[in-house]
Amino acid sequence: MHTGKISEIAYKRSVLKKICDKSDNLQVGIDGAHMAIEDVTMVISSNCILKWFLGCERYYLQKTLNDIYASGGSPKYVQLQINIPDDFEEKQLGRIIRSFDEAVTEMGLSIQKCDVYAGNVSQVLIQIHVIGVSEKTFSLKDIKENTDIVMAGTIAIGATSIITSLYESKLRERFHDTFVDGCLKISEFTNIKKITDVAKEQNILYMHHVSDGGVFAAAWEMASAVNLGIEVDIKKIPVWQETIEIAEVFDYNPYMTDGTGAVLI
């Protein structure tokens, strides 16, 4: 399998079909699982670090928080589960934890639980869990035929941010420093909270965070979840010039790669 979230077809075939008691939270296109506890509805989401680069702790934390925002929630609780190789240096572990703590603190939260295990793994494995309180719940069942879907944000912000971080020196050989510096700052646009805060005040039916697989995958997931087709006007999908330039250098389709920072509404 390719690196990243598995395909919608593989998820249905090898995950959903193997689970007997199917919760509504297990559907394709669900960003966060809702759980009602008396008069409070909690929303839960998780993510794992798939690529290591400068600032990856902050980036993957933001992806997880975005799932909570898109689910109509407000994050309250952050938990980390970390698996490290037996010979992993304690100083390296400390740097990772410090990076997470700085990112969490900057976002107005705190790490409430952190488990670290040393074992037979070849690299560090980190799972990020976030629990929030749902301020407004949405249901895929409300999506009917002829429903309009709009995208807030711009495509492939996540991919542009990651690739620039990984290949900064190579890009500086090809582009002016000002351009590369701008691409590095694109990570500042991965937070969708302002978008979802505005959307929640409107009469919307559903929100879906564009993430792994890009805007095409996100649109397909929404359509597949409600068993409907979808028509996309590609000319109306916002894309920045920085994204186009980076995609051309590394020969990938910006419509089909990490779109963290955009939301389908």
Residue locations for each model-derived region?
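Helix-biased detector of long, well-ordered alpha-helical tracts
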Residues: 1-264
